[in-house]
């Protein structure tokens, strides 16, 4: 069924409901049942284009995160470390992230949130490979198994996501925005965000879960606003101009603001923790947040068969399990500093250990719990 705008002002609530009912188009029975026939491809060409944009965008994002991490490592090893925002390399990573996010945002205009959001698992694989290549992380057997499970989950997600085409107009967004489901949802998000922000700012708690939960809460607003903005632009091109409605610019401002603060918290996480841990955990949190946002705000599972929903959730489970296998037992990154250990010289007694002082060009002793009187002069102890 094609999307039809209400003819007159009349009863606005009733008109909005009528428009919503016309804005949903589900595939025929059997469509979206996992079959990869030629008919399936023809029916889902627009969705597949969105999937391609999302995959490419996530690969670029994984590259950008590793570049930012490499920038932090370089700055930390300098004699006089500079702020990260003065690093050209760091800004290059931010620019790449913007490109990747642009591809992701565009993807939401061609496919449902519940289809695009879980595809962030592609960045897990990309991040692991890039970290092994450039940051010298170890590639383990569990990484390969996790990657395989992530791809299996992606296959199920693409084939069993709701086969829905939804026309997003300004009236539709306005109706969703004042719905009781979304109002309850956004109030809960604001409360959780304020509590976490209090612990982060006032208590100095910078645990990765706190940082990435803040990112995920902002991300839910991002995907809602991105879907609204891109949907209204598409509706303007295909049907009736929507850019004259104030709601378009309200959603645009929400999109920009939420993106800016996401970058702030995500950058803090990548500075403190290994990207091979940050990226996958961020994927899990973001995916859950985005799926909930799509279900509550855009009602993307409305009328979907139970089997489709079950297999879709199973695909999410496989994706998350793959992410867990990739991230488990990852040690926090430590800066590699050169030091000399006299005890490692064959036939020599251990006299002392010395290493470069991280903040000067001089040499000093490594701390030793058995002797708290070591001097920075490197003098030998009597044996």
Curated annotation (Swiss-Prot):
One of its GO terms (cellular component) is membrane. Residues 355-383 are annotated as: Disordered. The chain crosses the membrane at residues 46-66, 88-108, 110-130, 144-164, 177-197, 209-229, 243-263, 278-298, 306-326. It is a multi-pass membrane protein. It is found in: Membrane. Keywords: Glycoprotein, Membrane, Transmembrane, Transmembrane helix. One of its GO terms (biological process) is magnesium ion transport. Glycans are attached at residues 23, 33, 274. One of its GO terms (molecular function) is magnesium ion transmembrane transporter activity. Belongs to the NIPA family. PANTHER family: NIPA-LIKE PROTEIN 2, PTHR12570. This is NIPA-like protein 2. It comes from Homo sapiens. The lineage of its organism: Eukaryota, Metazoa, Chordata, Craniata, Vertebrata. The gene is NIPAL2.
């Amino acid at each position: 069924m094609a999307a039809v705008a209400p003819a007159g002002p009349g009863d606005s609530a009733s008109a909005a409901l009528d428009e919503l009912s016309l804005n949903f188009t589900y595939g025929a029975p059997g469509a979206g049942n996992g079959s990869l026939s030629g008919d399936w491809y023809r029916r889902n060409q627009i969705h597949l284009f969105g999937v391609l944009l999302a995959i490419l965008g996530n690969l670029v994002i994984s590259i950008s995160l590793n570049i930012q991490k490499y920038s932090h490592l370089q700055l930390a090893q300098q004699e006089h470390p500079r702020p990260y925002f003065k690093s050209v390399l760091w800004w290059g990573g931010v620019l790449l992230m913007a490109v990747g996010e642009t591809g992701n945002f565009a993807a939401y205009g061609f496919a449902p949130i519940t289809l695009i959001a879980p595809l962030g698992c592609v960045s897990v694989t990309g991040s692991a490979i890039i970290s092994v290549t450039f940051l010298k992380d170890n590639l383990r057997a569990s990484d390969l198994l996790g990657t395989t499970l992530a791809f299996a989950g992606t296959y199920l997600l693409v084939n069993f996501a709701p086969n829905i085409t939804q026309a997003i107009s300004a009236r539709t967004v306005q109706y969703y925005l004042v719905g009781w489901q979304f109002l309850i949802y956004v109030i809960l998000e604001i409360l959780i965000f304020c509590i976490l922000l209090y612990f982060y700012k006032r208590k100095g708690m910078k645990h990765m879960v706190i940082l990435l939960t803040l990112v995920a809460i902002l991300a839910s607003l991002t995907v809602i606003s991105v879907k609204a903005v891109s949907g209204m632009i598409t509706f303007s091109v295909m049907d009736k101009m929507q850019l004259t409605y104030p709601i378009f610019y309200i959603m645009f401002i929400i999109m920009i603001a939420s993106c800016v603060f996401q970058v702030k918290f995500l950058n803090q996480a990548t500075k403190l923790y290994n990207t091979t841990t940050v990226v996958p955990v961020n994927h899990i949190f973001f995916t859950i947040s985005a799926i909930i946002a799509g279900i509550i705000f855009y009602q993307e599972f409305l009328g979907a068969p139970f089997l489709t929903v079950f297999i879709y959730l199973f695909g999410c489970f496989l994706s998350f399990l793959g992410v867990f296998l990739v991230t488990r037992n990852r040690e926090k990154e430590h800066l590699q500093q050169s030091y000399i250990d006299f005890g490692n010289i064959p036939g020599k007694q251990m006299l002392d250990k010395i290493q470069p002082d991280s903040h000067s060009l001089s040499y000093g002793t490594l701390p030793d719990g058995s002797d708290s009187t070591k001097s920075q002069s490197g003098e030998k102890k009597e044996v």
